[in-house]
Amino acid sequence: MLNPTQVLFFFTLILGTLITFSSSSWFTAWLGLELNLLSFIPIISSKFNQYSAEASLKYFLIQALGSAIILSSAPSFLLFESSPNLLICLALLLKMGAAPVHFWFPSVMEGMNWPQCIILMTIQKIAPMLMLSYTHSPLTLSLIFFASAASSVIGSVSGLNQTLIRKIMAYSSINHMAWMLAAIHINEMMWMTYFLVYSLVSSSIALIMHSQQIFHFNQLSSHNFKTPGIKMITLISFLSLGGLPPFLGFIPKWLVIQELSNNKAFIWLSILLISALITLFYYLRVTLSTLTLSSPKIKNTLPSSSKTLLSSILFINFFPIFIPLSLTFFT
């Protein structure tokens, strides 16, 4: 049952993102960020989750620090040309949880429920990414390259020894942030495409985990799944998130690979590709542990709403396969 208060705060959260998206000045964009922050704190807070107070306090302190850096850098525009851009860029990286200022992101994710994790991994990244795309200069490009490389390495290596699914998804989000930062370097439409696909795939995994109430690696044993079909959809979703062809998650990565190759950014591309292979390894570790255990001999029927959700997730991940088939059919 949805809480009416949380629904109201969710709409104001979306409003804050839209204000940042449509703003014509840094001050208005900052106001949108603050409205977004103040709306998300009540959504995190829950009397049914003992860790929500800690997560909301951590999130508030980090976001307040990022906002303070943005405000303090404003007077520097009168004295310096490049320093304010660097400070704003660093503050935005802090707000979105990109490396090397990612330290808060996994612990905050761990203290949330799955629906709140979806918002943190997707909607909460839109406004900082938009503002980051406006800070174009040679110095900020160097910082974005460093943040992208650090996010790819930390997001891939740190996820290897995790046993909590939410932490695995958190480090996966940090790794995907590296690809989005590279896409920002290319053009605005590229990172929006990547972000849209990432949001669809990561949200589908979080919805499956929420429907099965899975939070720990050990819970992925097959008796936690109501039907064997959910196991296969979970496998496909994780492989799609890892960017394995022919699933949906491969398309934006392929576009970024092509553009980085055309721009002769081979070092950047090599770091991203190696990290993508490492993340794919721990996705496979999660999914293989799910598939290798036998299913229970219990007859379980899913409600029609769950069947619709699972069918939608399956179609989304297999969408790239349908494109050439439809083109062949209509030509």
Model-derived features: where do they sit?
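Core, highly hydrophobic multi-pass alpha-helical transmembrane subunits of bioenergetic inner membranes
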Residues: 1-331
